Amino acid sequence: FIYDETRKAPVIDLDNGKRYEFYTPDDTGTGTSFKSLIIFDLSILKLTPLPAIAHDSLIFKNIGDAPIDKIMELYMQSKKQIFISLDKDGAYSEKTRSILNKTAVLHLNEGGDELFGRSWNKKDATQGGL
């Protein structure tokens, strides 16, 4: 569980296999929407043969610290692969940082720690610059 029983859980309404609605009653906030998306993805990962999921840093930014901690615990419980990309690990709680440090496979940073050794969005010396 992400929250105790005082919070409303996300709901999925299926309509004859042609469409669906996925929402959290009375909460249309961005953080709640992204948290619900993560829970949905984890449910699909657990209940299907899908071997892995990936979550980008964008979906974590508006989720509070306590729910992020619980999401990290759920990630740890999975027997399947989960790939996540996070910016600014210092922005997360000590619990989440600890989980990330124990389980990280790859750390990327500026200054030589980029994938393939360089930043793709910067001009090199042959391209000129300001």
List each model region and its residues.
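Conserved NTPase motor "head" modules and their coupling/switch loops across ABC/AAA+ ATPases, GTPases
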Residues: 1-31, 47-49, 129
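Hydrophobic, Leu/Ile/Phe/Ala-enriched alpha-helical segments that form helix-helix packing faces
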Residues: 1-2, 40-43, 75, 96
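Conserved beta-strand segments of the P-loop GTPase G domain that flank and frequently precede/overlap
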Residues: 23, 54-56, 83-85
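Active-site-adjacent loop/helix micro-motif of nuclease/hydrolase catalytic cores
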Residues: 29-34, 62-66
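GG-anchored amphipathic helix commonly corresponding to the ABC/SMC/Rad50 NBD signature/C-loop
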Residues: 31-52
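Charged, polyampholytic interaction/assembly segments that form long, compositionally biased interfaces
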Residues: 43-47, 66-72
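Conserved P-loop NTPase "ATPase switch" module shared by AAA+ and STAND
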Residues: 48-63
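C-terminal lobe/lid and adjacent interdomain/linker elements of RecA-like ASCE P-loop ATPase modules
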Residues: 68-130
